[in-house]
């Protein structure tokens, strides 16, 4: 976790010039022009951290957790790249947002970058879960958990720091529920990166974009798949399906603002928050 935090802080500093390029510029919720897609650093941090830990483990003649870390960081890399595509090439009309928007575009003969992200994310989830789970039931449930977790994180990424905070809380719950299962080591690297990127996100120095939200959600979904029993995974899937369906009709931001405890937590640490 700490390694992820440190590497994220270093990577943000070293790549500041990269994200000043026009292709990464977008407007945030205040209408300010800032860098978007900085969340693509999450898989970079994860890969570097996993590489360093693998070398350390080899020196210590320890092999535990190497495969779990590799699966998580490579999956996160795939989801982040799909999100980055939407960040830099999908600055289209609001009508194309959400499942219904992408479906309308597809019916009219247009394949949006958001649709590419959803289809690609679903396929990636099937491939990854297929390597972990042998049965059909496990495959369908777990692939849906990973893909919908990534999309749910995207739905939450509508205000500075919101997605990062929810990621930290969700990981803490998962960590406690699984009694600090060692298979969460790879997910912990991603969460460490989330901690390192949170201050800049809250201060509106940059936006994570779909690249970051996708990465966070996919990592958490994969963490559930790797550590929880079938009943728990089905329960998580039901919640994720419900959130995705509700999002088509209700604004999460409005719901959060209308609920004092959630509003306080959502605005905690944010620039200009009441």
Predicted feature locations:
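Short, highly charged, low-complexity non-transmembrane loops/tails of multi-pass membrane proteins
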Residues: 254-274
